[in-house]
Amino acid sequence: MKISQIEKKKHLYLIKLDNGDSLTVTEDTIVTFMLSKHMVIDSQQWEDIKSFAQFSYGKSKALGFIAFQQRSQKQVQDYLLKHQISPDLIPSIIDSLKQGKWIDDQQYVDTYIRQNSLTGDKGPLLLKQKLMLKGIASQLIEPVLAQTDFSSIAQKAAEKIYQKYQHKLPSKALTDKIIQGLLNKGFSYDLAKGIVSQLSLEQDSQHIEDLLDQEFDKLLRKYSRRYDGYQLKQKLYQALYRKGYDSDDITTKLNDYF
């Protein structure tokens, strides 16, 4: 067999043989086999070229995927499968990328956690969950988490929640909101409690009274359509207490109204 034509197609090349066969290959395939027009090849060479072309194309797709953003090994594997690269070729493509340091799950973990320390707000539990969803083994994650101080990250996250709700919630509800917010972000309960204890959550009595008045009026409109008398009073008390208002303050408010 003889190569009758080599035609460039964007980033790939179309190779045509004189027997009518054709194959689209990467530039790496051209260079590796030193392919040129009029070159004579046998059937075994042609099979080798086709096999390498598939490998090279898959590797090229993977390199494009990781060119501008670091990826885990599983992310690259999933990407190749999605783009219909043969499952039989993927292990060799991954090995080649790992040898070239294009894929390194340990480095991925280090970078991910370091970036969170600089600009993120996630705790260790959430970080571990997200990294494991990317296919990274826990034994690569846990040592890095153990060496990371999360107190300053939790502090910033707590202050952000505080700023959002300080004018909307009474002290107890605000405390619960901050702790729950930190738990949702993957921080431990002990750390969340410790961080909250360092915050100044005291509110002046007038502010608390204003909040209570607003919440009372809103709940009164809601419950007065269905309840009255003692039942209404009980519903209001329970709802206000659940929202974190002090029992004595609620009782005073209810006695003033009823």
Swiss-Prot record:
It is found in: Cytoplasm. It comes from the Bacteria. The keyword Cytoplasm applies. The keyword Flavoprotein does not apply. Keywords: Cytoplasm. One of its GO terms (cellular component) is cytoplasm. Pfam families: RecX_HTH1 (PF21982), RecX_HTH2 (PF02631), RecX_HTH3 (PF21981). GO terms for biological process: regulation of DNA repair. Modulates RecA activity. Belongs to the RecX family. PANTHER family: REGULATORY PROTEIN RECX FAMILY PROTEIN. This is Regulatory protein RecX. It comes from Streptococcus equi subsp. equi (strain 4047). The lineage of its organism: Bacteria, Bacillati, Bacillota, Bacilli, Lactobacillales. The gene is recX.
